[in-house]
């Protein structure tokens, strides 16, 4: 078996080897997704590294193979590094398994040491000498940009050097478009051709066709290894590229423009020595080159490791920190990978595979996306989500050529959805299948051409959808819906995996996201100009700003329901609500610092069973002690009447040492009510099943001391008057207007009652009044 980092390479190399073998061509085959081209007679099988990793699930010891060749190992992508680590463990257990690692530019010493001092075989390539010159920008770098300097150097080569094709390396697609336009105006002796990953296939093919004039190919680092540009004599290298780095703490993929390694510089310069002696002009100093890293940081040290860790757990490979990676990833990245998988429900707290995890590991996609598929089965929208999931796992199929941007935008607008970029992807899929009842490659090409879509990516989309559909269909509990899934159900499914890309609008296209980070909706999104208060994004990319590449409007309660276990809940202003008989509170809900709800009135003990003890205290204190309980409760009415009776004695005698205080009343109920009584409803249920005799207060429970009857006789309830008795009210509240004794004179007696009647107080207060008057 021979692995290649890309499908196109696996196909083309297998075809070339088959052609070289002539009559033995049947011994060669290839395996790429569902386009398998091998038979029982196949002895040499070419495949992507991802395909071989998939085979490990059913053939962990690679019994089908006598030897494995890992080609293009210098690319050090996630699959290659994981595969090398895995093969390290298998070579030790299978002495008959031969392993060959091939590459044009790798650290041979590191690879040899990792594989127990494996022999190194060096094969001289068919290359010619390359002259390296260094030409850093003149003056301060703020005075002239790398793009301007690149254009100047290229124009000078065209004017002063012998004719020949030129390859320019620039870091971004935007740079390439700008450079191409400027060079077309300055250099008339050459054909100017762009080359980058999102370029349409027909435009990419132009670099391989003969031209009447020498060509200048303006490329990203795709021309380092992915595409071999023929006929190059000159290379102009800015030494820059966009290098993706996953930031574990913020869970963001960053794509800064950064300096490439020495190995990448040498890979670029080598492109000028394929057909004869060449020249490479590096637009930086030799000291700059000497100070660069010898090799590019392996992808495994700058990527999200969730998918790798999930596969390792599935294959029972043990602790990733002890796995024999050639260059081990950071422990923080491993911890973040585990945390992500636990949040998605793929692993339990002991890092063991869950039922969700087993399903997710069977899908050749990011765990975030496979989790979405599982959720869609619950929401009866599996048909739509498998389409969207397959689209999210590949590059966006929509093309926007520089020369026809307006036409492309108009074509894409046909599929737009004002609320969701994900629905736009679904519309593209449905649009193709609506226009083409039966599948054919010619129909797909026509559809892509008419709608400015990449044929290659649409083909990848169809292939991956078929693969995911087969995997899901094998699951007995998974059912594809026949009726269209609703917008809500589709996006609630998406939230199961994409919740971390949620945000609330601050202003315009700026959103407040989780963990106190801000992000913008990408300008290419249909929601960029007009979006709702709450959105989810498909993925985050950080360039000049942090962008959500795709977006969709959502309701905040969908987000909360999807992330209940991850949300933090806090309560304030806990109080008893007399009308409902419940203990209520103001609730605040936050998801990683993002406030989903604030001051929401909720039934406090019902929100969390941990709230029951404190809710019980509030209920006893405010409903029972503070007399706010309503409804028919015999014990409560009796207790209230008894307490009120003896409190009146306290007011008459002007002392507070007769009736127990509120704390003692609280303790009385707290000792007698069980822990599960925390509101009027639970109290009613308790009384119904257990009676209320144990809740009735006796005078012994209420009184601190029993006052003398003779003392109380000095405080009569009524004042004798000529026509009828006048009621008296006693209050012991010093400093208040009604402190003392108040005569409650009926309105019809006000004019008929002589004032001197009130000169004499009740007997119990005469001594106090006399003392006051003497003073």
What residue spans do the PLM features occupy?
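P-loop NTPase motor module signature
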Residues: 1-372
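Generic recognition of stable, solvent-exposed alpha-helical segments in well-folded globular domains
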Residues: 8, 12, 47, 64, ...
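Short acidic-hydrophobic surface loop/beta-edge motif
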Residues: 34, 120-123, 508-514, 715-723, ...
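Short polar/acidic secondary-structure junctions
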Residues: 35, 224, 526, 733-735
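Extended active-site and interfacial segments that coordinate phosphate-rich ligands
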Residues: 59-74, 238-246, 250-251, 255, ...
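Short, isolated positions in well-ordered beta-strands
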Residues: 128, 519, 725-728
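Second RecA-like catalytic domain
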Residues: 182, 188-189, 194, 236, ...
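A positional "C-terminalness" feature that preferentially activates on distal terminal regions of long
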Residues: 471-505, 524, 559-565, 570-775
